[in-house]
Regions:
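Alpha-helical transmembrane segments of multi-pass membrane proteins
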Residues: 2-128
């Protein structure tokens, strides 16, 4: 029987790892970084809407920036994908994961007083 080659990025095992890491990043950012979700942008959109309706402008900023950073992360991943030539040594997915790791490693050193920056960068990494 002939075995069909499967893209590693489409494996169930990697899907489980990504779901777990996304959940961890949400738990970390919500519990440790001022009640903002890193990965669950629907939750941030809900909290953003509530903050707008209450005219609580500091909270609007707190939820808006991570949502925009997540969108920027998606655009950055697309930019990497489109700019990468197939003949390069690294695949665009590998470069994207490397960018995520660099950003998340940097977030570890951001103090709690800069939660808006930390949450925005974490959301950027989740968007990649």
């Amino acid at each position: 029987m002939k075995k069909i080659a499967k893209q590693m990025s489409e494996s169930i095992e990697l899907g489980i790892v990504l779901a777990a890491s996304g959940g961890f990043m949400d738990a970390y950012s919500y519990i440790m970084r001022d009640h903002v979700f890193a990965n669950a942008q629907t939750g941030n959109m809900l909290l953003l809407g509530v903050s707008i309706s209450e005219r609580n402008w500091p909270e609007v900023v707190r939820y808006l920036f991570p949502v925009l950073a997540f969108a920027a992360g998606i655009m950055l991943a697309d930019l990497v994908r489109f700019r990468m030539d197939e003949k390069k040594r690294l695949h665009w997915r590998q470069i994207s994961v490397l960018l995520e790791a660099i950003v998340l490693a940097g977030v570890c050193f951001i103090p709690v007083s800069l939660n808006l920056l930390a949450n925005s960068l974490t959301s950027l990494a989740c968007g990649i």
